[in-house]
Amino acid sequence: MSMEEDIAALVIDNASGMCKAGFAGDDAPRAVFPSIVGRPRHQGIMVGMGQKDSYVGDEAQSKRGILTLRYPIEHGIVTNWDDMEKIWHHTFYNELRVAPEEHPVLLTEAPLNPKSNREKMTQIMFETFNAPAFYVSIQAVLSLYASGRTTGIVLDSGDGVTHTVPIYEGYSLPHAILRLDMAGRDLTDYLMRILAERGHSFTTTAEREIVRDIKEKLCYTGLDFEQEMQTAAQSSALEKSYELPDGQVITVGNERFRAPEALFQPSFLGLESAGIHETTYNSIMKCDVDIRKDLYSNIVMSGGTTMYPGIADRMQKEITALAPSSMKIKIVAPPERKYSVWIGGSILASLSTFQQMWISKQEYDESGPSIVHRKCF
């Protein structure tokens, strides 16, 4: 089907922590908001206050004191469809201010997303929102496109889940995809714990957001953990101060690199899994021996949890230690990697060669939700 020039496709990246949405062809998403739905904890007392039965995104975040907050996407997979529908409704009508029945919609999905989930997404887009056309794409594959490659291994780490996804000539290799249930949310929790050791107690969901901000502004990945610990113990060179919303100033020291270190040493969180470096290596080793060289030289980082300063150098060091000694290793960490899934979607949906890939409303009406497995891979 040919798309009219002026009708831009909508690109929506639904991640565990933040939803990114905008128009195909743009270089950044127009809307980025938390993937949260909040419902009032108590019945409204004041009559006529127009209290809504649910709030989404930033509004839910700002009213969090009176709401129960729920994330409908857990570990990258949608687990609550009613709440998910609210997030999509909010995306179309409040954030982008578009009529979904007028635009093709590209959604993203986690690697290894269950088949029933893809069908449900397809059904909701066509039946609830009456989209004229639809497509669903794997997040890591889009990140790779955004880096200008079609072959490589993507380490995608967001708020809810981390995946290593080997991709060859544009196709992900499902047998070699590995999932780590450790990501930004866990690092925030860990930072809350180690700040408590210093006497700074953060407990509520509202205070957790403060800790997330500390994490994003002050944390970094050390090249050599033991070395950093020594430096921190001997001097105050690594200390930084942070002002809390009430004006109190706290000092953050070795917590700055101890929290992100858990990515390489999950035992810090009480997890028995391999770190991100080892998981990446294991993923490569599950691939055919002939393509490993191409993967080692194209290790692409994506997602907010790969944004720590120093993480690429550390990754280079760790992979070099695991790989064969003659292997050329290249870590690619684009500055815009927080949004590279969305950017890849924007690129894909605006390619002229992609226009025949859309699932049209007509095809959906003829075949039903299972059409998604034939057209999107």
From Swiss-Prot:
CDD domains: ASKHA_NBD_actin
Subcellular localization(s) per the UniProt record: Cytoplasm, Cytoskeleton
GO molecular function: ATP binding; hydrolase activity
Entry EC no(s): 3.6.4.-
Keyword Transport: no
SUPFAM superfamilies to which the protein is assigned, alphabetical: Actin-like ATPase domain (SSF53067)
Protein name listed in UniProt: Actin-2
Protein source organism: Absidia glauca (Pin mould)
Phylogenetic lineage: Eukaryota, Fungi, Fungi incertae sedis, Mucoromycota, Mucoromycotina
